[in-house]
Amino acid sequence: MSSDKANNQSPDQGANTPAESTNSGPKLDGNQAVNLAAEQSKSTADKNLPVFGDLPIPEDTANLRFGPNLHDGLLALLPLVGVWRGQGQAAHPGEEEFTFGQQLSIFHDGENRLGFESRTWKINPPAEEGAEADGDEASAESAGEPEVGELLRREAGFWRIDNDDNIELLIAHSDGMIELMYGKPLTERAWQLESASTLATETGPSALGPGKRLYGLMPNNDLGWVDERLIDGEMVPWMSAQLKRVRG
């Protein structure tokens, strides 16, 4: 199945969207890629994925300073490497729009591929103020603070790219769908992909059609992304988020 998809909205009011903040630019240069990644990671340079320490093969790393060298074929994807965390908005058909939290880990093992894992969870609205009226001090203290709700979908897979910068994104969705997306870098700080094939299991999502994703680094070096899906014959917003680098 194939799909079309539109532009992105940033959850951070006042910030440009990834599409707006990553206008066309020169083809990626190795030194530029390293410099951009270094600027992004000044406060997270000493942090990385947990490691086992006794594997006889290279460990996965989300920090370009540790572990094996990044494969030369991945330069166009280099700025994505890291662990990113933040919040976003989801608008699923038949449901009210809700806020979710996300951790997105993008890592490598020295081979010509990136691995990734995404975890999301629902963020419930803050408890109503005045909870102390019920005599619950703990509730009163947490009034106004958002609460972590149910766990949502997980994704895992791989980013691959060839010598002509054609990207393949292979995604396994925890709710019972496998997806292949193709795309290209828009600039050295933005990447756009769209579904080439989706396969749902018998218990997987029957209404979720093919989609299109845009990932982009914003002027503040946050990673923004947006996903739209073909639902009932038209492309509609599905999920979008703005994530800060926390490791790498």
From Swiss-Prot:
Polar residues: bias regions: 1-25, 32-43
Region (Disordered): 1-49, 118-147
Organism of this sequence: Corynebacterium urealyticum (strain ATCC 43042 / DSM 7109)
Positions of short motif GXWXGXG: 82-88
Positions with biased composition (Acidic residues): 129-139
Name of the molecule in the record: Ferric nitrobindin-like protein
Lineage of producing organism: Bacteria, Bacillati, Actinomycetota, Actinomycetes, Mycobacteriales
Family, similarity comment: Belongs to the nitrobindin family.
Pfam family, one: THAP4_heme-bd
InterPro entries found in the cross-reference section: Calycin, Nb(III)_bact/plant, Nitrobindin, THAP4-like_heme-bd
